[in-house]
């Protein structure tokens, strides 16, 4: 039976972990290295860092954060945010990341996915997609890809499912799908979106956006078909521990790595 992964997500801004609702109203959640070490000790299967700092002047801070984190944790670390070139990817991998996550830059330069996969291997390339439901009531479900998610998200006109298919064809080895409608709202994943993606993806899919309880993660796996489930708020602010989630899943027959 395939073991499902539990992944805490750390949004890093100017060297601190923050968390907002639908990308806004950020609350400070602590030091990234300290949080990463705590999640490592608590039994997390992987960690994701997203650098949401707007200023390129502060990008060096993220490299330092990754270096310090890699020295403290012994689980896979994915880093995304502001990676616009193969050199950017190399810099993060050299600092200690195991995988890099591409989002906005890949939309504007899809060949970046292929270039990264050729240089580092598909297993290193995660395509992260921020998707928003755009169908009118009564219409078949449809989601659009947005970039620059934050205070000023930009619609791309790209259909999320078609973009994910293309990203996989270009060499992405994993998909992280984030529902913009659910992000930070703690109402559960967009299961319809998740199902649409897992139905067409030959590579692992990570569910993101909307977790409020272990049951939401259970539904993401059992109903949505996710290979891994990502969460931020419920972990950062002490609502649930990684152990709480794994215990809940294991009691309901989901295979997880216990510590």
Curated annotation (Swiss-Prot):
One of its GO terms (cellular component) is cytoplasm. InterPro entries: Aldolase_TIM, His_biosynth, HisF, IGPS_HisA/HisF, RibuloseP-bd_barrel. GO terms for biological process: L-histidine biosynthetic process. It is found in: Cytoplasm. The active site is at 11, 130. SUPFAM superfamilies: Ribulose-phoshate binding barrel (SSF51366). GO terms for molecular function: imidazoleglycerol-phosphate synthase activity; lyase activity. Keywords: Amino-acid biosynthesis, Cytoplasm, Histidine biosynthesis, Lyase. Its EC number is 4.3.2.10. It comes from the Bacteria. PANTHER family: IMIDAZOLE GLYCEROL PHOSPHATE SYNTHASE HISHF, IMIDAZOLE GLYCEROL PHOSPHATE SYNTHASE SUBUNIT HISF/H IGP SYNTHASE SUBUNIT HISF/H. IGPS catalyzes the conversion of PRFAR and glutamine to IGP, AICAR and glutamate. The HisF subunit catalyzes the cyclization activity that produces IGP and AICAR from PRFAR using the ammonia provided by the HisH subunit. Heterodimer of HisH and HisF. Belongs to the HisA/HisF family. This is Imidazole glycerol phosphate synthase subunit HisF. It comes from Chloroflexus aurantiacus (strain ATCC 29366 / DSM 635 / J-10-fl).
């Amino acid at each position: 039976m395939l073991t499902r992964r539990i992944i805490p997500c750390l949004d890093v801004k100017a060297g601190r972990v923050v968390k907002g609702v639908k990308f806004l109203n950020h609350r400070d959640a602590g030091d990234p290295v300290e949080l990463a070490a705590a999640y490592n000790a608590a039994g997390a299967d992987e960690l994701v860092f997203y650098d949401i700092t707007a200023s390129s002047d502060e990008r060096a801070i993220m490299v330092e954060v990754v270096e310090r984190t890699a020295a403290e944790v012994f689980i896979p670390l994915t880093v995304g945010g502001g990676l616009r070139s193969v050199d950017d990817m190399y810099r993060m991998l050299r600092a200690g990341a195991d995988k890099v996550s591409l989002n906005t830059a890949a939309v504007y330069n899809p060949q970046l996915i292929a270039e990264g996969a050729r240089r580092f291997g598909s297993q290193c390339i995660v395509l992260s997609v921020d998707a928003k439901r755009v169908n009118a009531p009564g219409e078949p479900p449809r989601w659009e890809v947005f970039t620059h998610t934050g205070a000023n998200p930009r619609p791309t006109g790209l259909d999320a499912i078609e973009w994910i298919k293309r990203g996989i064809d270009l060499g992405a080895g994993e998909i992280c799908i984030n529902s913009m409608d659910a992000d930070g709202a703690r109402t559960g994943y967009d299961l319809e979106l998740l199902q649409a993606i897992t139905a067409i993806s030959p590579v692992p899919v990570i569910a993101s956006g909307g977790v409020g309880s272990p049951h939401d993660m259970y539904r993401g796996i059992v109903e949505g078909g996710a290979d891994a489930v990502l969460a931020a708020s419920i972990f950062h602010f002490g609502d649930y521990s990684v152990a709480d989630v794994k215990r809940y899943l294991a009691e309901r027959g989901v295979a997880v790595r216990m510590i």
